[in-house]
Amino acid sequence: MRADFSVLLVDDSKTQLAHGRSLLQQLGFSRIQLASNGRNALRLMAAGGAPDVLVTDLEMPDIDGVELLRVVAEQRLASAVVIVSSHESAILTSVDDMARQRGLRVLGVVQKPLALTDLRTVLERFESPTDIAEESSPMLALSAADIRRGVASREFILHYQPKVTTTGGVLKGVEALVRWQHPQYGLLSPASFIPLAEESGAIDELTDYLLDLALTQLQAWHAHGLAIAAAVNLSAKSLPRLDLADQIAAATAAVRVEPRFLVLEITETALMADLALSLETLARLRLKGFSLSIDDFGTGFSSLQQLSRVPATEVKIDRSLVHGAAANPTMQALLKNIIDMVKKLQMKSLGEGPDNEADWRLLRDLGCDMAQGYYIARPMPADNLVEWLKHGTKHLRLASGLTGRH
């Protein structure tokens, strides 16, 4: 992993600070700063600039970790944060959600005492393609005209992250994740331009273009014998379009890809915000044979009754409920309830964000159908997928107790 970025470690315990610094040094980091509480951390950041990664405890005197995160978010004092605590999972989940809602790039939540493997896992996300996808760049001077020009110039590209079965790691599909190769700003994440596209009305043009990209790639894979599905994110702003289902069906037919190989994803929160408005389009898409996936499930407080009204084929459980769940009995109980509920509705379940073997095994043992996360593979260009299939799934088969070729 890269170890050339700066880290600020905040903890009121001298022992924990020394331990954390030792772990960071073992990982190859040299640009390390230490602070004994939130106020000292803010002074350091004011004097020396924002660190690349802030690693902070929560319970501290004077300014605690929660207040520190709020100030860091308001003043944009860190590129990314790691939350560390020995508190129960409910508190950690709330703080994690609060930080993300404030626009912070949360690499992960780690239980104390810090372990080398856990710290390595979260810090690796700072450089990963998936983490790039979560980055927000609110200061960029972008406009709807820029997005339309980018579409016309084919500056938007797709990377693909594998979705595999938890029993053997068999590839079933990929999620198409958009990036913008901007001529001035470089590679931009969706957070940098999707909100603007939605607000300005440019989202439909962008969505149509990305669907064409994904379908063209599916056609190429299928022609070479790789019969997998591809998932494309659908904005809630697009759902009221009366012609959406017909247009997607026409685009699929044009490249001779069967509708069942295209999965359309929409987040739980966006879906439930105006379920009545969405249901007509979703029903028509299902009637035409397309698969529907509810993304980020577990963050929007949907009830079983609400979920049963959606003609979805798949539920993607949010990574905040999956990451670290193997060491968290409360999260395990939540996961089990969601997976069991999804089974009762005769949908497929997919766990997002397993970053280690323990979380991967937990998803398998709880009966989750599929998984998608760093432990499996990071998002990759389309050309890399076949090579990954040859060499990248061995650890999944071993973790599943399988040894032969599958």
Residue ranges of each PLM-predicted region?
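C-di-GMP signaling machinery
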Residues: 125-157, 197-201, 242-245, 279, ...
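Active-site residues of response regulator receiver
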Residues: 11, 57, 318
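Helix N-cap/capping motif at the beta->alpha junctions
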Residues: 12, 34-43, 65
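Alpha4 helix (beta4-alpha4-beta5 surface) of REC/receiver domains from two-component response regulators
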Residues: 67-70, 74, 87-108
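Bacterial c-di-GMP phosphodiesterase EAL domain
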Residues: 139-256, 270
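EAL-family c-di-GMP phosphodiesterase catalytic domain
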Residues: 87, 109-120, 236-238, 265-273, ...
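Active-site beta3 strand of CheY-like receiver
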Residues: 49-55, 82, 312
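Two-component/phosphorelay signaling modules centered on CheY-like receiver
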Residues: 5, 14-33
